[in-house]
């Protein structure tokens, strides 16, 4: 390795500011703040907003989005406009044309039987 180009790998304390959970690990992160750790030594301090102690995935308090509620909000906001476009004459005519074309193709090709 070339000397002088790599960041310093050192012990650092991360503090989750949402619940004051802290842990010591090693990192190359540079900080100006320090904290006195349980062992009496002073370490660089990095403040984080989410850790394994506060993240919903790890705590089991995940919020499940109510998709039905989101659909209802959309319908209230756009209501008849969105429904009219989706079920308008154009959509019905296109569906009818596709069905007619499929029937015509099926009628043209005779079914071959294996002997």
Swiss-Prot record:
MF-aspect GO terms: structural constituent of ribosome
SUPFAM superfamilies in the cross-refs: L28p-like (SSF143800)
Superkingdom field: Bacteria
InterPro entries cross-referenced by the UniProt entry: Ribosomal_bL28/bL31-like_sf, Ribosomal_bL31, Ribosomal_bL31_B, Ribosomal_bL31_sf
Any one GO biological process: translation
UniProtKB keywords: Ribonucleoprotein, Ribosomal protein
Any Gene Ontology CC annotation: ribosome
Keyword Zinc: no
Subunit and partners: Part of the 50S ribosomal subunit.
HAMAP family: Ribosomal_bL31_2
Family the entry assigns: Belongs to the bacterial ribosomal protein bL31 family. Type B subfamily.
This protein's name: Large ribosomal subunit protein bL31B
């Amino acid at each position: 390795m070339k000397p002088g180009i790599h960041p310093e790998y050192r012990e650092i304390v991360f503090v989750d500011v949402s619940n004051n959970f802290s842990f010591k690990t090693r990192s190359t992160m540079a900080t100006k703040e320090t904290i006195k750790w349980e062992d009496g030594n002073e370490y660089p301090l990095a403040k984080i907003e989410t850790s394994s102690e506060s993240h919903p995935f790890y705590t089991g308090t995940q919020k499940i989005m109510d998709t039905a509620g989101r659909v209802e909000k959309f319908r209230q906001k756009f209501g008849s406009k969105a429904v009219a476009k989706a079920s308008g004459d154009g959509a019905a005519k296109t569906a009818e044309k596709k069905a007619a074309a499929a029937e015509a193709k099926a009628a043209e090709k005779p079914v071959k039987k294996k002997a």
